[in-house]
């Protein structure tokens, strides 16, 4: 795409200056990125980045790009990699991959034997924190580790293919200046495939958006639904918060994680302290629709549906009656089909490829999930959530420190990350270090 066509694709986006129920930080396309000032802000406010990660991500280019971008953030207090790995050798390889960064990097082995033993011991206190394994469990552990010292914590996925210095800068700056009064920041973006430039984000575009519109027609403009609708990309997995908020959030353990966290934020924070920030064009791994409700985007949508409806119960005392299920099905299909037509127009004028038939099939598949999803919720209205860290520390004060110890790679010969020699020379700042490739991992991300 040449420069002219790129500007064309972005003009709508850059000229948007509308505000809504929550503060919106737009990208006006001016490129006003000041990394030197951002580094100074980081040094004055202990800030950690948390990246939940599977070992398979180390063989993909995205994580190498993230490492390269972050290697320029010398003021960062800590990078926490919440890693699911099969062996201590994998953990060692991950440590090698991130060696040479200008800040401490802690690779936390989320499913290591010591962590499992520690969390299993919590059953004696009546607490089930042993899983299920997944992003929610990794985020929960990573927050426990990161919140020991950091005042601000930002979370990014490990598969972002468009990661740039603007991502952490725009996500964290609203929280680094206390005068803004912001406690929580969530990303939004335009999901486009790097290869084909096709619209992505079907779960958000074709399920969550139409679902919230349909529910608002059934229940009216109740505050909780208006709140969810205020987010331009409610399923964004990139967000940041102040430590006091992070410590008080329960963490969902399924595909409802992002909506569930929004529900928790709604519970704890005034709307005036919530913001969303535009990260521009964004691409990461894509998930297939799936051939049945237990697969792919269909499984994700089913769990998101349950999370949205539980939020209505919790915050509004409202639930769908059996006789309202057909209404929801009809409304969702109508709104979903309207969205397909609208996205088709959007794609056509922006000269983006668009398969309307496949989009219609996705809406049909999502619609079939509504009835069993609502009925299942009536049978099991309470979902498993991991307790907040403030709740845990009220009954076992040393759990955070114990978790850090348990999550470290078991070895006596290699110093822990916080014992490594300082990266700063006595005479001044060290030159920017070059991250080293992870030799034990094949293929190596260069």
Q: In which residue ranges do the predicted regions lie?
A:
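Active-site-proximal specificity loops/subdomain of glycosyltransferases
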Residues: 90-150
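Short beta-strand/loop segment that forms part of the nucleotide-sugar
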Residues: 75-87, 106-112
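A recurrent flexible, glycine/aromatic-enriched loop bordering the glycosyltransferase active site
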Residues: 195-205, 216-238
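Conserved donor-nucleotide/metal-binding helix-loop-beta segment in metal-dependent transferases, i.e.
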Residues: 163-189, 193
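Short beta-strand-to-loop acidic/aromatic patch adjacent to the donor-nucleotide binding site
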Residues: 149-161
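Catalytic donor-sugar/metal-binding loop of nucleotide-sugar-dependent glycosyltransferases
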Residues: 253, 263-282
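N-proximal low-complexity "stem/linker" segments adjacent to membrane-targeting elements
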Residues: 8-71
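Terminal low-complexity segments of carbohydrate-biosynthetic enzymes
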Residues: 2, 8-27, 102, 283-285, ...
